[in-house]
């Protein structure tokens, strides 16, 4: 079968030390410290086969390009990949996907029915392949699994004709049938994963909101835009998005944003205070990936606003120092939380239900492409911000 594969050279930086979970020449939890000169290309690879009774084979229908895919293929001036996390190459990329079950092991249980997965069942899947038995998993934190693997990062992913996953990571999309027809069902299904990342950030880690609260989202990428839709559906009074791209600001309005800010032309602090009548926001989402640039403005809003007890949730991956002023968070009773992943807490089924109830995330898909075009668009998305989500659509 055909698949989009990433190859890179294992060439650790001088200061890198092999960690306890790293495997020399194969796998690291610090990708940007090790992998150099990435190449992305379409190749022929063997079709996956069921090896455990709990596994399913999925015929991939749709798979979106994530910023992580872009950063695994993008390099700094020394040729090292930008993505800082868990990676093991070569690997088939792709983790924002949906498809249909074409084979199911005898113990592959569908959590929607508590019965074996049906052949032809439309599904999506988590990319965080948690073990379920380490201490973080046992305490209910699968996104921080000590034995974590990740689909499309160190386990072969879904920019392919077929992908194999354990049934415990798969979620039925039957609820979307009748709401989305034809390819749109699978396009919507491919957006469950990134939308769940946003849900985990603003609802699970950020603590959610009370209806009537104000929220501010910095960064109008897919995660930021998903947060706009989720928080508006959760009852936010004023959803404010800050984003330089006009295309993305307009999409935010379509998804429910009450106000949008162009930070290159407007004073972010004054705009937020004006839109909220001086109260500020209960929740801020940092989704820009450049926290060192936006943090001073977030702090100033928190300091000057009449409202207290704000939460700042950091969701964008960035190996950057934040210029934090502790006094601001002490006096204004504010807090910072980090957010990683999308697993646990019933996040996937809740996102699917939101989509079934009318939260249409397919609006963010700028273009559908073939598998052969994926390497080109992974490269193009390094610089082209007019495209929000590019999604592979298989026949």
UniProtKB/Swiss-Prot annotation:
Zn(2+) 2 binds at residues 131, 134, 137, 145. GO terms for biological process: inositol metabolic process. InterPro entries: ADH-like_C, ADH-like_N, ADH_Zn_CS, GroES-like_sf, NAD(P)-bd_dom_sf, PKS_ER, Scyllo-inosose_DH. The keyword Methyltransferase does not apply. The keyword NAD applies. Its cofactor is Zn(2+). Binds 2 Zn(2+) ions per subunit. It comes from the Bacteria. Belongs to the zinc-containing alcohol dehydrogenase family. Homodimer. Catalyzes the NAD(+)-dependent oxidation of scyllo-inosose (2-keto-myo-inositol) to 3-dehydro-scyllo-inosose (diketo-inositol), and thus probably functions in a myo-inositol degradation pathway together with IolG, IolN and IolO. Has no activity on myo-inositol, D-chiro-inositol and 1-keto-D-chiro-inositol. NCBIfam families: keto_inos_dh_IolM. This is Scyllo-inosose 3-dehydrogenase. The gene is iolM.
């Amino acid at each position: 079968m055909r698949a989009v594969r990433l190859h890179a050279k294992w060439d650790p930086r001088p200061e890198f030390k092999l960690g306890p979970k790293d495997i020399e020449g194969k796998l690291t939890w610090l990708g940007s410290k090790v992998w150099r000169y990435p190449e992305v290309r379409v190749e022929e690879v063997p079709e996956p086969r069921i090896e455990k009774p709990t596994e399913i084979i999925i015929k991939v229908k749709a798979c979106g390009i994530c910023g992580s895919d872009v950063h695994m293929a993008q390099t700094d001036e020394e040729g090292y990949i930008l993505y800082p996390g868990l990676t093991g190459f070569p690997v088939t990329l792709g983790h924002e996907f949906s498809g249909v079950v074409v084979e199911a092991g005898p113990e592959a249980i569908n959590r929607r029915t508590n019965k074996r997965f049906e052949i032809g069942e439309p599904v999506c899947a988590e990319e965080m392949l948690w073990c379920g038995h380490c201490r973080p998993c046992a305490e209910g934190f699968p996104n921080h699994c000590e034995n974590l693997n990740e689909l499309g990062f160190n386990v072969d992913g879904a920019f392919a004709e077929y992908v194999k996953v354990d049934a415990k990571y798969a979620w039925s999309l039957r609820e979307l049938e009748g709401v989305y027809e034809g390819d749109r069902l699978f396009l919507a299904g491919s957006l469950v994963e990134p939308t769940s990342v946003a849900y985990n950030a603003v609802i699970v880690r950020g603590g959610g909101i009370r209806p009537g609260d104000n929220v501010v989202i910095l960064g109008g990428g897919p995660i930021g835009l998903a947060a706009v839709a989720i928080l508006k559906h959760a009852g936010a009074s004023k959803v404010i998005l800050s984003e330089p791209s006009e295309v993305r600001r307009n999409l935010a309005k379509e998804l429910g944003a009450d106000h949008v800010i162009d930070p290159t032309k407007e004073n972010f602090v004054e705009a937020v205070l004006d839109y909220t009548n001086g109260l500020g926001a209960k929740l801020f989402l940092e989704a820009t990936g450049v926290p060192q640039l936006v943090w001073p403005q977030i702090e100033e809003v928190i300091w000057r606003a009449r409202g207290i007890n704000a939460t700042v949730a950091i969701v964008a991956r960035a190996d950057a120092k934040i210029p934090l002023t502790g006094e601001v968070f002490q006096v204004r009773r504010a807090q910072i939380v980090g957010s990683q992943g999308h697993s646990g807490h019933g996040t996937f089924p809740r996102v699917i239900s939101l989509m079934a109830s009318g939260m249409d995330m397919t609006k963010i898909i700028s273009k559908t492409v073939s598998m052969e075009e994926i390497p080109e668009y992974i490269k193009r998305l390094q610089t082209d911000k007019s495209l929000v989500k590019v999604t592979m659509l298989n026949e």
